[in-house]
Regions:
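Residues forming anionic-ligand binding surfaces in small-molecule and nucleic-acid pockets
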Residues: 107-114
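Short, glycine/charge-rich beta-strand/loop segments that flank catalytic centers
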Residues: 73-83, 149-156
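Active-site loop segments of alpha/beta catalytic cores
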Residues: 1-36, 44-45, 58, 69, ...
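Segments that shape or occlude catalytic/ligand-binding pockets
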Residues: 37-77
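Alpha-helix termini
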Residues: 55, 80-82, 89, 98, ...
Length: 256
């Protein structure tokens, strides 16, 4: 049966829900940014990671220049890391922002969010940048194009705040400290997701890099599955899980 012509947003939502579409949905839930695109559009890193106007302009090119059905303004995985006490290098024009200092890496460090949280979270420059970029995209596209927000889940945030190697080692050496990290950080993606939806995002990409390249599938089951089951329903919009790397052996857990 033929399907009437759809807007990009209608097409994306229909595809997400397994419903008929007028043509295959073309979209990226993470980022389409590359050097050639930056040269064509104008904005480059680091400004496109730190200033809302360049961020929104570069994100908009996914639809305006390439015809994708969705746009995504948060290009990296460390946008909210400074708001939880990390030091992030945003200066490299050739790379994504990279965490440089993990406040919980010292074993004597107290696992807690910064003083003033959650107000301090929304005062962070890079959090503000992402929210303002979403507002600009909403003003530009209205309800025509799917605007995707993105948050890091507690596992990826733990990589930033705890240090990747130390965190992964402690899944065996000190699992209680790992659980405390996950417990402490679980509120962050909920707050950020809701703020992005209020700013104009239509759905949230939830990035938690519990990949087979780093941990066994049973660790996802034991540490993270039940948290995802509790946290994701608190986001009042469609949520799309993103997990880079080898993940086939945990797909069944993702489905749960």
């Amino acid at each position: 049966m033929a399907v009437d012509s759809m807007t990009p947003k209608e097409r994306f939502i229909a595809a997400l829900n397994g419903q008929p579409v007028d043509r295959p949905c073309a979209a990226s839930i993470t980022s389409v940014v590359n050097f050639e695109l930056m040269d064509l559009v104008g904005p480059h890193f680091p400004e496109a990671n730190t200033e809302p106007e360049p961020m929104a302009e570069l994100a908009a090119s996914a639809h305006d220049l390439m015809g994708f059905d969705s746009v995504m303004p948060i290009f990296g995985i460390a946008q909210e890391a400074t708001a939880i006490g990390c030091v992030v290098d945003f200066s490299d024009p050739d790379n994504m922002p990279t965490p440089q200092f993990a406040p919980w890496a010292d074993r004597d460090a107290e696992i807690r969010l910064p003083d003033g949280f959650p107000d301090s979270f929304f005062e962070d420059k890079h959090v503000k940048c992402a929210l303002d970029a979403i507002r600009l995209l909403k003003s530009h596209f209205g309800n025509k194009v799917m605007i995707l927000g993105k948050v890091m889940g507690p596992w990826t945030l733990s990589y930033h705040a705890y240090n990747v190697q130390e965190f992964l080692m402690d899944t065996i050496a000190d699992p209680d400290r790992v659980r405390k990290s996950l417990d402490t950080l679980s509120q962050v993606p909920i707050l950020f997701a809701k703020a992005q939806l209020e700013a104009g995002a239509d759905a949230i990409v939830w990035a938690d890099h519990a990949t087979g390249d780093l941990i066994r599938n049973t660790m996802y089951r034991d540490f993270l599955l039940w948290r995802h089951q509790e946290l994701v329903p608190q986001v009042p919009a469609p949520v799309i899980l993103h997990c880079c790397g080898r993940s086939l052996d945990r797909i069944e857990y993702f489905r749960e």
